[in-house]
From Swiss-Prot:
This is Peptide methionine sulfoxide reductase MsrA. Its EC number is 1.8.4.11. It comes from the Bacteria. NCBIfam families: msrA (TIGR00401). It catalyses: L-methionyl-[protein] + [thioredoxin]-disulfide + H2O = L-methionyl-(S)-S-oxide-[protein] + [thioredoxin]-dithiol; [thioredoxin]-disulfide + L-methionine + H2O = L-methionine (S)-S-oxide + [thioredoxin]-dithiol. Belongs to the MsrA Met sulfoxide reductase family.
């Protein structure tokens, strides 16, 4: 039976190999693919992606998980306080970014960032870019599911076991109180 009710998230947080590898195991995630987005270069490739970020496109089942849960996991597995860098990887390709698809995703992204900053779980200011999703250029086959094919391959992403974002009321709920 084909799934008809799915949603999409597009996130960038350093080298796409590690982000994809961790997200593909999350409950409710149906599929992932890596690629390039957030820059101006058409038909982006690994060798020519200009100002694009390495990103992962996540297709998920909203009956099992939601966008906020995916974003909380995103902030748990990468450092959102380092501009244009994750681990040894440096440059705009490795920036922290959330590429929203609609106004609701933008609202959830901004609220989640506010919660991350209020939590003090990270030592600095969150520098994650929040931008409207643009064209997503799928990366070459050798980059798809890279760490499944090469389990000991390079990654700078990991789940921080004690990192748990406290739930807080959304900004709109506070204004109505």
């Amino acid at each position: 039976m084909a799934r008809t009710n799915t949603r999409k998230a597009i996130l960038a947080g350093g080298c796409f190999w590690g982000i994809q590898n961790l997200f593909r195991r999350q409950p409710g995630v149906i599929s992932t693919r890596v690629g390039y987005t957030g820059g101006g270069t058409p038909n982006a490739t690994y060798r020519n992606h200009g100002m694009h970020a390495e990103a992962v496109e996540i297709i998920y089942d909203p009956a099992i998980t939601d966008y906020r849960t995916l974003l909380e996991f995103f902030f748990q597995i990468h450092d959102p306080t380092t501009r244009n860098r994750q681990g040894n990887d440096q440059g705009t390709s490795y920036r922290s970014a959330i590429f929203y698809l609609d106004d609701e995703q933008k609202k959830v992204a901004l609220d989640t960032i506010a919660a991350v900053e209020a939590s003090s779980l990270w030592p600095g200011k969150v520098v994650t870019e929040v931008s409207l999703a643009e064209d997503f250029w799928e990366a070459e086959p050798e980059h798809q599911d890279y760490l499944q094919h090469y389990p000991n391959g390079y990654t700078c992403h990991f789940v921080r076991p004690n990192w748990k974002l406290p739930r807080r009321a959304p900004a709109d709920a506070k204004a109505d109180s």
